[in-house]
From Swiss-Prot:
Family: Belongs to the nuclear hormone receptor family. NR1 subfamily.
Gene that this sequence comes from: Nr1h2
Stretches annotated zinc finger (NR C4-type): 78-98, 116-140
Tissues/organs with expression: Ubiquitous.
Subunit organization: Forms a heterodimer with RXR. Interacts with CCAR2 (via N-terminus) in a ligand-independent manner. Interacts (when sumoylated) with GPS2; interaction with GPS2 onto hepatic acute phase protein promoters prevents N-Cor corepressor complex dissociation. Interacts with ABCA12 and ABCA1; this interaction is required for ABCA1 localization to the cell surface and is necessary for its normal activity and stability.
GO MF: apolipoprotein A-I receptor binding; ATPase binding; chromatin DNA binding; DNA binding; DNA-binding transcription activator activity, RNA polymerase II-specific; DNA-binding transcription factor activity; nuclear receptor activity; nuclear retinoid X receptor binding
UniProt modification remark: Sumoylated by SUMO2 at Lys-395 and Lys-433 during the hepatic acute phase response, leading to promote interaction with GPS2 and prevent N-Cor corepressor complex dissociation.
Cross-link Glycyl lysine isopeptide (Lys-Gly) (interchain with G-Cter in SUMO2) residue location(s): 395, 433
Protein name from the UniProt record: Oxysterols receptor LXR-beta
């Protein structure tokens, strides 16, 4: 099997084996927190490391890309005054009143004319927002409203003219056709929105569903690319040395735990980009991630399964057989179900959109332990279930069992998750310590 060309000597926290260094691109939790130990005051917390990687990335403003706003549920509140929110305005969930106030303040330079009769720290609500404009503007900025998002009168005029021109009917022309004679599908939806025959005739993805799928697929691609950059930092798989030596066994175990850390980081990065996830409270974010991470890792493992070689490939170049899993310290009772699940998933033949939707559905599982707002989690899950149902009916209209088969795989993952818990317990009996991040995500208490 292939291995990275560089060896690193930074110890994995808790087991004394090598692990990737903790530079800005490292998959470990130093990426954003700079400390491997929990921050002061968080000792004893079961989620100190997870909280760190859930924090927003501190990246330059110019690198942030505008994406579609998460779907509104109808009961969101304005981040400025607490009134009912109407949508995302100038980068913040806010009401129409605060949206208009912020725009007027920026366009007409109101900030220089506002004054506070108090100490400049007025508490803002639907009543006080009319009483103190200076503190209202301050609260707008604290909530995250960006002046650069506000268009000037001239920009608005040009945008209005451009929109009117786009709405004018184009000259008649023949629609572009695909090789099958149907109009070509829009990019990113695997032609699902344009396919249809038999039972699937007439079903179409809504514009919101197409946008959702495109966003999820793009987010997965972005997270995968970020993981590839961490490949050279992984402890090399020992080659040539005595495979039964203590050093070789430790190195193989460190290699696998570092791959797991990269995978966890990738899953957290993806979850933060799934519309609706960051609307949840921090406790529910942590609860959902703790319960779903191993199941998503198994889905991604199945995605990388090669039925011809009966091997699984991670990070493009790391390929593992059943024997490799066993040499890394995993039990046959866990290895065999992984490969059986991977073969079953391959028979379903999921594409990128189906995998992304299935992972999003898995994340928003309201019955997870310690979830504080299960009804809200369930409401966030529903649009992804509906999108997957429509997508599968369009893509495979003759296969009416495809959608329920996919959902049944989530049930299989629950069983595999239980087997994984037994595997983690077995590692403890072998005195193999997991890095802190994995210990927290899998609730391992030393």
């Amino acid at each position: 099997m292939s291995s990275p060309t560089s060896s690193l000597d930074t110890p994995v926290p808790g087991n004394g084996s090598p692990q990737p260094s903790t530079s800005a691109t490292s998959p470990t939790i130093k990426e954003e927190g700079q400390e491997t130990d929990p921050p002061p005051g968080s000792e004893g917390s079961s989620s100190a490391y997870i909280v760190v990687i859930l924090e927003p990335e501190d990246e330059p403003e110019r690198k942030r890309k505008k994406g579609p706003a998460p779907k509104m549920l109808g009961h969101e509140l304005c981040r400025v005054c607490g009134d009912k929110a109407s949508g995302f305005h100038y980068n913040v969930l806010s009401c129409e009143g605060c949206k208009g106030f912020f725009r007027r303040s920026v366009v007409h330079g109101g900030a220089g004319r506002y004054a506070c009769r108090g100490s400049g720290t007025c508490q803002m609500d639907a009543f006080m927002r009319r009483k103190c404009q200076l503190c209202r503007l301050r609260k707008c900025k604290e909530a995250g409203m960006r002046e650069q998002c506000v268009l000037s009168e001239e920009q608005i005029r040009k945008k209005r003219i451009q929109k009117q021109q786009q709405q004018q009917p184009p000259p008649p022309s023949e629609p572009a056709a695909s090789s099958s004679g149907r109009p070509a599908a829009s990019p990113g939806t695997s032609e699902a929105s344009s396919q249809g025959s038999g039972e699937g005739e007439g079903i179409q993805l809504t514009a919101a569903q197409e946008l959702m799928i495109q966003q999820l697929v793009a987010a997965q691609l972005q997270c995968n690319k970020r993981s590839f950059s961490d490949q050279p930092k992984v402890t090399p798989w020992p080659l040539g040395a005595d495979p039964q030596s203590r050093d070789a066994r430790q190195q193989r175990f460190a290699h696998f735990t570092e791959l797991a850390i990269i995978s966890v980081q990738e899953i957290v990065d993806f979850a933060k980009q799934v519309p609706g996830f960051l609307q949840l409270g921090r406790e529910d974010q942590i609860a959902l991630l703790k319960a779903s991470t191993i199941e998503i890792m198994l889905l991604e493992t199945a995605r990388r399964y090669n039925h011809e070689t009966e091997c699984i490939t991670f990070l493009k170049d790391f390929t593992y057989s059943k024997d490799d899993f066993h040499r890394a310290g995993l039990q046959v009772e866990f290895i065999n179900p992984i490969f059986e699940f991977s073969r079953a998933m391959r028979r379903l033949g999921l594409d990128d959109a189906e995998y992304a939707l299935l992972i999003a559905i898995n994340i928003f599982s309201a019955d997870r332990p310690n979830v504080q707002e299960p009804s809200r989690v369930e409401a966030l899950q529903q649009p992804y279930v509906e999108a997957l149902l429509s997508y599968t009916r369009i893509k495979r209209p003759q296969d009416q069992l495809r959608f329920p088969r996919m959902l049944m795989k989530l049930v299989s993952l629950r069983t595999l998750s239980s087997v994984h818990s037994e595997q983690v317990f077995a590692l403890r009996l072998q005195d193999k310590k997991l890095p802190p991040l994995l210990s927290e995500i899998w609730d391992v208490h030393e």
